[in-house]
């Protein structure tokens, strides 16, 4: 199970207009022992772009061999 404040990768495309598969967020709350997560996604200025509840299957931990990437949101 992932822990609060862990960085996670969105592992599917989202219905949220500004999120895409591969975006990185932070777990801010854990539901039902890890069955779901509240995840915050922020922009480069630290402003919240989305705060959404996701199933455990929708996110995964960042792998040690993965490189972070930047993209425009609008």
PLM regions and their residue ranges:
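Basic/aromatic-rich interaction segments and small domains that mediate binding to polyanionic partners
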Residues: 2-65, 70
């Amino acid at each position: 199970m992932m822990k609060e404040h862990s960085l996670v990768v969105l592992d599917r495309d989202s219905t949220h207009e500004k999120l895409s598969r591969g975006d990185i967020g932070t777990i801010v709350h854990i539901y039902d022992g890890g069955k779901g997560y509240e995840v915050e996604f922020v922009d480069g200025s630290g402003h919240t772009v989305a705060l959404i509840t996701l199933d455990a299957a929708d996110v995964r931990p960042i792998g040690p061999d993965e490189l972070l990437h930047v993209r425009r949101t609008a």
